Amino acid sequence: MLIFAEALDVAAEGAVWYCRRIGGGTFEAVHVPSKSTDTGIHARWFDYTGGEPRLDVRPPGSDPTEVVLEKVAALRRDREDVVVTVVLPEQFRKRSLLVAAQRAQFRLKLRLLTEPGVIVADVPAVTSERRPEGHVPDRLILRVLAGAPDPRTHRAIEYAQGLPGVDELRALHFGPRDWNDSELGIPVEDAPLTGRLGDSILTEVRKLTADPATAVNVVLPERIDTGLRRLRGPRAVAIKRCLLFEPHVILSSVPTRA
């Protein structure tokens, strides 16, 4: 696992908690300085994490995408069976899709979606606080969005089943279905599809995050077609937009290439 940390803030606090929870305490972290970087981030990171892991601070002017791809390659060690989760803490002062699309992390996410063996996990926070708040969730619940028992959904479930430290794992399906839970191998929750899919997802997720001690990792099976001008489907984009600023929600994209 790898955290790409822009700052040591509330979002990074959540990312460290998540990595410790599902990574068995073992993960790496990297930082590329920018104009707004806190010059003391290395020391503050050490104090916050106790030195495990140390923050790999790269030289100013380094390309974030190249740095992350280099770290991913080192973690995979040329093994095709190794999956690396890249955790991206993203903190916003306000809910703005325009601001989110202009950030360097947006371009990084698009590039990572095309990288074999990489899962991208967004850990967002909307706050003006510039330091960790000092409290994190106690429970981690996973919901795999399951439209049908197809290869994309099975791959997402396989990834979710391999994550330790999870208190509950289920699939989440909206609307009627003509297949059984046994086709996925995990329990399936059925929820009504009322209006837009994104609104229905938010309704179900908020039932879980109403408990402030609970965080929800929404696992999204995503079809990626690198041969098309439009890399991602409109369904996946709409889901990501509705969850990007949602408190206590982590969004993990599990891409399957067409």
Q: What residue spans do the PLM features occupy?
A:
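Structured cytosolic domains appended to multi-pass membrane proteins
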Residues: M1-S253
